[in-house]
Amino acid sequence: MRLIVAFFMALASSLTVAQEMTEMRSEFFYCTLNDGKTMEDVREQSKQYGEFSKENGTHYTQAILLPMHAGETDYDYITWGTWPDGKAMYEEWGSFANNYEAAAEEVTGGAAGTCRNSIATFFNLVARIPMDAAKRDKKSPVQFSRCSLNEGVTLEQVAAQEMENVKQMEDAGFEGLAIAYHVPYMGFNETPDFDFVMNYYWYSFDARAHAAQNYGAFAAENPEGQEAMDELVSCEGTSSFVFETMFNNLPDTEG
């Protein structure tokens, strides 16, 4: 079955508490629009690269993030790309480096944006609550928070507790949520002052609204989940964005 919400569904059927987390790879480019260009130009050029990627058989998916509540920023948008593993990452980069120059010349009007900062992460999908495809939004909300492990705690311990908490949320009627952890990989100018970034993705704004309205009461009735997380990890600096998939050339998967 073709992945609909690319990287948030790719591992969902295989992850369990007992398993070691399977790492995908992500990259983030922080970009500003060039003079006379709009986000429609950005979307069009991304989709054109998606066609190139598809023709060359590389396994890569790309999305655009627009700041929603992200504080003062020095960029207009973020391009977020993901591969299923490290092998696919370097195969796609090799295709881009060696073959895309000629294809890029066919893009009329020049580049839509200038990207001045780029980072790569190890991307671990931890847990998700499904939602019917018909109920999902084309553009959906995501949040990122910087997190530090408490002394002696491992990421696997945090993920195991996260899975328990998300299962409890699902049993309580929440839906349309995926949670992933991004561990710094490359491109960070200084040693990060955090261990990982927690990434919440909602499949629709209605799902996010339901969580905003009901999570407080749920947490009050089930305090043990958050208390357990507080013993493992500390998170701060939450920012929110609008997420929109541009293309998805990840391989077919079951689940």
Where are these regions (language model features)?
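N-terminal signal peptide c-region/cleavage motif recognized by signal peptidases
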Residues: 13-17
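Short S/T/G/P-rich N-terminal loop/turn motif that feeds into the first structured element of a domain
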Residues: 18-225, 230-255
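Positively charged n-region of N-terminal signal peptides that target proteins for export
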Residues: 1-4
